[in-house]
Every structure is written in structure tokens, then in C-alpha cells.
């Protein structure tokens, strides 16, 4: 911290000879007050003398602090063009007092809510409203953060003897200060001070004459560039008295850009591995404009400079290399530029000479050498822990598209090729290896990316969703496509980064294998991975075709689309419907994963928010059609509940969901029971038979588009379906770790027991239902020989038929039955059992038995439009066969039904289900999505947030069937 140059000297000169560390400041002779010509001038420190001799035209002031402060913050003030000695003479207009003052105040790096910002303040005029002491001939303007000891003072401003005066100023303060985001501690004090005096002698310290406050939070939101008057007041017997006014010309608070070259030169944040106090407290000129090759030459890597940089880098130690890890960005920029191919030449490699290929191999060799230097160990965690070793990351919101250019082989290859630049946050070696893989795929598979070079029109804010937490190159794609449609297969997934390698295959392959062999939670470096129901989606990113289709629908911020049709295209049924709708230019978005569903709904919510911000009237509800199975609707429901939990309740009316069933769909069956027109549209035999086939029909047997659009255009009534909560307690994949919980909303059916083995809707405690959006239960998978005849139609009710239909599944992990304990509590309506007996509704009820299946439904009874606040449970238990002599049998013995007993319990508000044996793990199907490795689960009839209903559109004027 620099001490103030002593205008007026006194004992110790500036600050009285404080032992404060930092750069000293010289005081120009022009600033000496004429009243004290006899006092000796403070000698200039040796280090400062060099700086003073190089620029004799500028004088300096300093940022001062109390003598007790030990902060290592730095401040430098430069004053120029000050008034002539003796002040303004008679008849002469005084020149404005010009000073430029700079300071950098320390920032609490341990707090995530404290960020550095740059504050700029320009003062134009000082007006004294009250006559001060007669011997007051000079004042000082100082700035200070409330609660801080750091003070930045100007040079002394000479006041004429007339008393009430106006002094023209050209005073600029530039401060890098700590801004606290979560507490009201951003008050900047503008103080009018004078030197302390004792018996007509100047002594150490300053006396504050008046103070004015500036709220930095308001300045950050509303910068001011016009004339602004700040009143300075003093307290006399607890009464505020105006003393002076300061006219402010400009006032702003800006974030500090750590990405620019200038910030790279002047960023004094210490490296994690090389922290030193000396580095922090010195504003070294070696870092600013230095010719030292360690600081200056790695900023840009053009082709002719690359060889020189390589030779110099090979001489560096690993310690110095670690401190400059961000330069890998520029290295990749240069490498990608070398592969830049013009459109006229094409994407062939015929024009590339062997010498150029050898040079590229040399460059890659050098790059991997540097990567090994940054990560000398092959063990897993270090690679993620040093993801940002330049400085502590500052809190910020990441846009959805951030990182896509590093990881998508199809969406952003065009921008990499044309711009030759990378996105942000590409310093981790894992992402660098992914980039290498993208580049090699681009060289070998050019035809795959010819059509993917268009610029996206959707902005970053449109795609800001939950899926943006981690975007990395997927190692494997989990969206099996059964159709050969080019528009769906050509960009089905980012899987095409797998395959070929560059000539550096020997070195790149082991690195890739090391990364992919680690657990997924370590590769994504996310502590929430174990608890996220969409863990597997961290390895996926939405395809470019999804954004293109969104661009055609979300045309303008001024208007919202009337309807959007989401189609699950992971099976032939969805592809078939999507192709028919696209042929007639309907607003269709084809999705293959939960990430894409989230991207579409997030963009839609963002557009609704923009519309509400720009219009006083409420928007009409946007109709969102979900064309797919029950598991597809479940993915939409999960995002809807999670996104709207942080919004106000009026957002619940901005969207209306339309359910178009493809295959088994309990929710659709219930909707058909309360809406006859809906039932005749989607639940008749023609629709059911069409989508129960194993392959698409050759010709269109019925008007699919007509039925869908009839529903989309005619659904004017909103039916609210209650949202229930399922809490799954899952076994951790590591034996020594504790179990963890997942909270999943549902509106349909939860099953446990002999659920059908559907790999398309599998999810477990370690992996989310990535493919829970895929094959519905009507289409048998290609790798399974299970009989699906019992599930070709939707279940008749939340009743026995659906439960009994799954009894004969040969691949069930439980065999024929499973021992369960079901504890349940009854709600207000009470319990109605088929046997007719009654129980105490206030106590817990327990069922312990050997079950064939347990099924819990949140849907109301068929035909009942009025919603209930409870659930219904259907259990199928195994009964022992009674040994009866055949002589007494008058009829042929019944077959398998004699072994099973069905029981329906209604009015349940809460339920807990667990296996009798503690080591037995359950498989639970929630709205068609299967979760495994479940220790036990709990169901509640109501979701805990204000999102308690799911709005579904039905035909107007419909009557229950």
C-alpha cells in the first residue's frame, strides 16, 4: 500500500514515515502549499527516484491507509496539470485541478459472493457551502469503502481565502474493489478531509470534515454519465449539516474481464501451486509490457512463430509451465488454423503435403508433452482438481451453448473451421483430448459435417437449462435408431466423434482410454452426479437439428408460437409420426434424449419470459404436444416440475400439454375416460393397431396428421392432473458409501415386483434413464425375445389387468414373487377395500406378504373428472394351493388364477415399500421409467412445491364416456 506523498510535509513527510510496504509516491514541487515554504521536503525513496526521473512532468498522490493496516493491496495515484504555485492570482481564471488516481484493493478470495469490480468516478467541481476554519487553506478528497481500512486520497486542493468557493476539478478515481453480492456492504464514502494540526503545526493524520455515501449496488445497475450532485454532510450533535457539494461527471462499476489479453498481463491472482505474498503485493512492471519471453511471446501463435515458441517451451521447467496453462487455448487455435480449408478446395487431403503432415505431428507431439507436464500422474482425481489453476474461479452464470464448440463433432465444426477459435473454459486436459478427437474426426469424416456449418440463431439465453451444467464429448450414444431416415440419422447424436484418429493415435489413444476408464462421476467432475436423476445426460448435448427446428418455430420475441409438437424419435413410431408432420410443415421438434427435451422446454420458457417482459398483457397458453410413450411424458413432467419450482405460480398457466399416446399409456387411457372425443381420436382400435406393429406400415392406413392436428387445434380446456412424489433411496455404487435419495414426480403409475424387462426404459442408481425416452412397451426390442402381447394395449385401469399382465415375465430378477413390506397411511377420504372392512385412518397400516406385483396409481378413477388427494394401490399376492382330494372336485380345477389374490386399497396419502430381506434391491417403474438398485421407496400423494398439478389439454365440451 503506497503512502501518500506529503504535501505540506510534517514529521515523517508523507504519512509520517510509516513502515507500510508498497511503492512510494513523490510529490511535485508545484503542489507545495505556499504557506509552508520553510519546511523541508521529504526525501524521495531510492526506488521511486528512478520512476520520478523518467517522467518529470507528472506528480503523484497516493492511496493511504491507517497505520495499523497490514494489507498487501497496491495503490498508485498520478496527478497532472495541477494549479500553479501560489494558487490562482487575482484576475486569473483558475485551471481545474487535474488528478488521476488508481488503486487495487484486496478481494476476499475465500468468499464466493465477493467479486472484483472496477469502479470509475470523475469529479468536476467542489462547492463549499459552509465556511470552515479560518486557517483552512487546503482540503483533500478521499474515497473509502464502508467497513474497510483502505483509503485513496487525492493531492491537497488549495482553497482561496474567500471562504465559500467553487473549485473546478478534473479528478478521476479508478478502483478495483471487492463487491459483495449477498450483503449490503457496498457503500463508498466520499470524504472531505484536511490535515490534522497542533499549535499551528501539521501533524500525522487527517480530520474528516464531511462525508457522502454512494451505493455501489445502484451504480452497478444504473451507471451515470451525466451531471450528478453529491452532498457532503457533517454531524454536529447528531444533526446532519451540509458542508459541501461535489458535482460528479461520470459514475460506473464494471466487471473485470479476465479473458482479455490485458487482464492476462495484469491479473495478480496467485497460482494455486505458486502462491507468494511478494507476487500479490507488487504491481510489477515486468508483467506489464515486458520483453521477457515468459510473459510476452505466448500471446499469439501464428504459423511462422510456432517453431520458435516450441523451442523455447522445451526449455521451461514444469513449474513455469503450470502457471501458463491457459496458453493451451492459443495453441489449439493455431493447430486448428493449420487445418483450415477453403470451400473452393474442398475437404479432401490431396493438397496437404507430407511436410505439412509431419509438422502437424510435431505440433501434436509437443502439445501432448506439455499436457503430460501439467498432469504428471495418471491417477484420476488430479485431472479434475486442477481444472482451473490460474486463479480461483469467479462466480458467474454459464450460458447453455458454452463449451459446445469443444465437444460437438457436428454442431460446431463449421465455426471451428471458419473462426479458428475456441470457447471458454477449455483448459482441462480431458476437454483438450476431446478437441483432438473432434479435429481428427473432421479430417477423416468431412462429408458428415458439410451440412452442419450453418450459424445458429437461437441465443445463449434461449438454451439456458439444467442440461448446461456439464457438456463433454459423449463416449457412447444411447439412442438406437431403427429407421434409415437421413434427417434423423445424419445428426442423431454426437457419436461420430468415435472412430478414426489422427497420425498421433499412439499417443492420444492411451489418454482417451485412461479418461473413459474412470467412473462417470469422476469424468464429469460433478458432486451432484450421484443424486441427479439425469446423470447419464451429462455426456450428451442436443443435436443441431433440434436447434434448427426451434429456430423455425421461435421466430420472434414479439410473438409466441401457438403450439409446439415434441416427438420422441428414438423408435419407428415417433419417426413415422414426425415425418408425416414435417411433410405438412407442422411445428415439430424431434427429440432423442432428455437433454433435448430440456433444451426445447427451456428455450420455450425463456421466450415466454421475454414476452412477459415486453408486454403488459398475459400471453396465451402455449400448447406443447408430447408425442410418445408414458416414459416420454415423464421426462417432460420432471423438467416442468423442476423448472417452475423457482418461478411464481402464475407460470403454471403459461403452458398446456397435449398427450398423443404411442403405445401403452395409462394417463392417455384416463383422459379417454373423461373425454369421449379424445378417446375416439387416440384410443380406438385403428390407432392402437397401427402403433402396435414391429415396423412402420408401407402406406398410411389412417390420417395420423389429421388426428394430431385436430387435437392440437381443438384442445381448449385445461384438465389439471395431480402431481405425486416418489422418493427413491438408492444403493451407492461404492460399497463403503452411504445410500442417497432421488425425488421424482409422477402423475401415472408406480410399479414394483415383476415388472416387464424393458431395456429401453431402464435406469438405475448409478445411471439415469438416458434411454427412458426410447422404445415404448408396444414395440419389442430387437435383442429381446419377451412376449409383449399382454402389453400391446393400455391397461384397463390402475387395477389387476396391468399387474397380472406382467406375471409371466421370464427375465425378472425376483423369479415369480418377491417378499415385500408395504406401510401406508390413509388420507381424509378413508380406505375402501374390496373386502369391506375398515381400519383406523390415523395409524399406520402394514402389509407383509409374498407379492407378485404392487402397483400404485395417482390417477383418479376412470370417468371421474374431479380430482382426489389420495392414491390407490393394487397388490397381487401369492396364495398357497390348498390340497383338496380330487374325489370332491365337481368341476375342472382352475388354472393359475387360484394362486393369486388381488386387493385394491384406496385413499392412501403416503406409502413406504421395502423388501423383506435387507440385501434385496428393488426395481421400480415410475411412469414407464425403470429405476434399479432401490433399497426402499416412499410415495406421497402431493408434490411438496407449489407445482402441484400438470396442465393437460382436452377437447372443449367433451363428456365423460
UniProtKB/Swiss-Prot annotation:
Disordered: annotated span: 1-70, 76-95, 260-297, 375-426, 475-540, 758-802
Residue ranges of coiled coil: 351-375
GO cellular component, as recorded: COPI-coated vesicle; Golgi apparatus; perinuclear region of cytoplasm
Task of the protein: Coat protein that is involved in the localization of trans-Golgi network (TGN) membrane proteins that contain acidic cluster sorting motifs. Controls the endosome-to-Golgi trafficking of furin and mannose-6-phosphate receptor by connecting the acidic-cluster-containing cytoplasmic domain of these molecules with the adapter-protein complex-1 (AP-1) of endosomal clathrin-coated membrane pits. Required for normal ER Ca2+ handling in lymphocytes. Together with WDR37, it plays an essential role in lymphocyte development, quiescence and survival.
Post-translational modification Phosphothreonine, affected residues: 44, 502
Full protein name: Phosphofurin acidic cluster sorting protein 1
Family per similarity comment: Belongs to the PACS family.
Compositional bias (Polar residues): 404-426
Modified residues (Phosphoserine): 28, 377, 379, 428, 493, 517, 526-527, 529, 532
Domain of life: Eukaryota
UniProtKB keywords: Acetylation, Coiled coil, Golgi apparatus, Phosphoprotein
One matching Pfam family: C2_PACS_N
Subunit structure: Associates with AP-1 and AP-3 but not with AP-2 complexes. Interacts with FURIN. Forms a ternary complex with furin and AP-1. Interacts with PKD2 (via acidic region). Interacts with SORL1. Interacts with WDR37.
Biased composition (Acidic residues): 274-291
Compartments where found: Golgi apparatus, trans-Golgi network
Predominant cellular place of this UniProt entry's protein: Golgi
Modified residues (Phosphotyrosine): 249
Biased composition (Low complexity): 20-30, 51-70, 768-802
Biased composition (Basic and acidic residues): 260-271
Record's compositionally biased regions (Pro residues): 31-46
Biased composition (Gly residues): 1-19
GO biological processes: lymphocyte homeostasis; protein localization to Golgi apparatus; protein localization to plasma membrane
Residue numbers bearing the N-acetylalanine modification: 2
